[in-house]
Amino acid sequence: MSNVFDSKSFLKTVTSQPGVYRMYDAGGTVIYVGKAKDLKKRLSSYFRGNLGSRKTEALVALIEQIDVTVTHTETEALLLEHNYIKLYQPRYNVLLRDDKSYPYIFLSADHHPRLASHRGAKHAKGEYFGPFPNGYAVRETLSLLQKIFPVRQCENSVYRNRSRPCLQYQIGRCLGPCVEGLVTEEEYARQIDYVRLFLSGKDDQVLNQLVARMEQASGDLRFEEAGRLRDQIQAVRRVTEKQFVSNQGDDMDVIGVSFDSGMACLHVLFIRQGKVLGSRSYFPKVPGGTELAEVVQTFVGQFYLQGSQARTLPSDILIDFTLPEKDLLAASLTALSGRRVSIQSKPRGDRARYLKLARTNAATALITRLAQHSTIHQRLAALAQTLKLPAIGRMECFDISHTMGEQTVASCVVFDANGPLRSEYRRYNISGITPGDDYAAMNQVLRRRYGKAIEESKIPDVIVIDGGKGQLAQAKEVFAQLDVTWDKSHPLLLGVAKGTDRKAGLETLFLEPEGEGFSLPPDSPALHVIQHIRDDSHNHAITGHRNKRAKVKNTSALETIEGIGPKRRQMLLKYMGGLQPLINASKEEIARVPGISTALAEKIFYALKH
């Protein structure tokens, strides 16, 4: 127990109402957030003789201050608790690290609606179908829809400026509503209705309508149309036969749980209108000594009560665990969504099959993750031994990418004890240096990265510099000149030079810019982790460089034209649908762009043609 914190005096001031409490350590950092129906009773339990777990003992020993927020109801306390957990990320709370919004399929409200992938706030007018577990599931579904229902998926800027149909029309994946006369308004609207029904899980209605139209066309001797409808019917049937579908048209999430070796996996199946849209495995950060009940309870709360997750609430949640506060959580979700949300742990029939499937997936994913962590732990231990370090808890690696000195981008990749920490990967646009000067680029990125205050937990044990002696010398110089409050002598700087023919396994490692380096055997686990972080850093840098180069390529031709500033440049590209359509456009078409006069259109036309 803390020698500074006076628990007796503090408890005299605490009310017995519901609310949320935040515990701070000596540095003023929030280390735990909790909620209580009775704050006084709950907080008193932390300062009794027998705390019941090592985790709680360790937590209480660090307490220097406790802040309390009183709420009207326990439901309010639950919502506030999860908002605070998201805000402060306390070390003693179970943390859901993946907090990305989910993608949807968007059907626009345009005159000729389009299909698209959407993620984020739902500002655009139209219909949203989902959520899907990831972007891949959305792309696969859009590709499938395009083959069955040839509805446009192009941006409005492209659609509005076409005078002839694109390749999608030529290969039968779009009806070509952009060009007058290719498809009737009635037929396009009918295909949109089919898409809407299909995404709503009403496959039978789609098939019934298609069959009726096919029979009508056949009876009227319109055999070519009947043949197209037959092919469309077969495509829909092939898709629906492959799906594991619930007869009830359920709208639910199914959560399977697996827990082993201090690691938890919660696998979520997303089911909408009876169809499995996909699934995703989650591995929340679990403090040592945490009970499974707390892990599951906290995960479910964070998953549905934090941020964007609240917009994706299903009608039912099936979970492979009896939650201690199931009724409270269900009441909170019901209040949040404005409709009844139920939580079930012992379903029957098809729902029991779904739960078994989620449980199996959770167990399989956990076995895979444990094996991966075992491998990365072994590799980091081997590298620590090679570098004569007690342990390696965090590594960072830097690489530079450019083309002939242009669009230079530096990348920083982060590994922790469990491998790649992708949420902390960063790219830096490098400017103000001589083109092609990799040393100056490395010098700049290291100063930007480390020339500021850094949390103690984020100071790397090893910094890998891709480039060998010269780049390592730059890193040593930067660190010698840093004027910072954190211990700049802590990170070990390691240079990595590729072999003469740049083959993996022939790398030379340098701890100092002078003298000979050393090599590790090709089968060395220590070398493997260096190769892993080096390759990730290279890929991250080159991807950023290519994106930057493509952006410049699309605007550089316009930048040379007098009278075309950033706003007009953006308007031209957006209205015409990109640089190539603009290059192919006539003077009259360019003059239709808002803000572009006939004289300026002529100037643009000749500048792009010559």
Swiss-Prot record:
Location within or outside the cell: Cytoplasm
SMART domains: GIYc (SM00465), HhH1 (SM00278)
Record-linked PROSITE patterns: GIY_YIG, UVR, UVRC
GO cellular component, one term: excinuclease repair complex
Domain spans labelled UVR: 204-239
Molecular-function annotations in GO: DNA binding; excinuclease ABC activity
Alphabetical list of PANTHER family matching this protein: UVRABC SYSTEM PROTEIN C, UVRC/OXIDOREDUCTASE
Family: Belongs to the UvrC family.
Subunit note: Interacts with UvrB in an incision complex.
Protein name: UvrABC system protein C
Name of the gene this protein is made from: uvrC
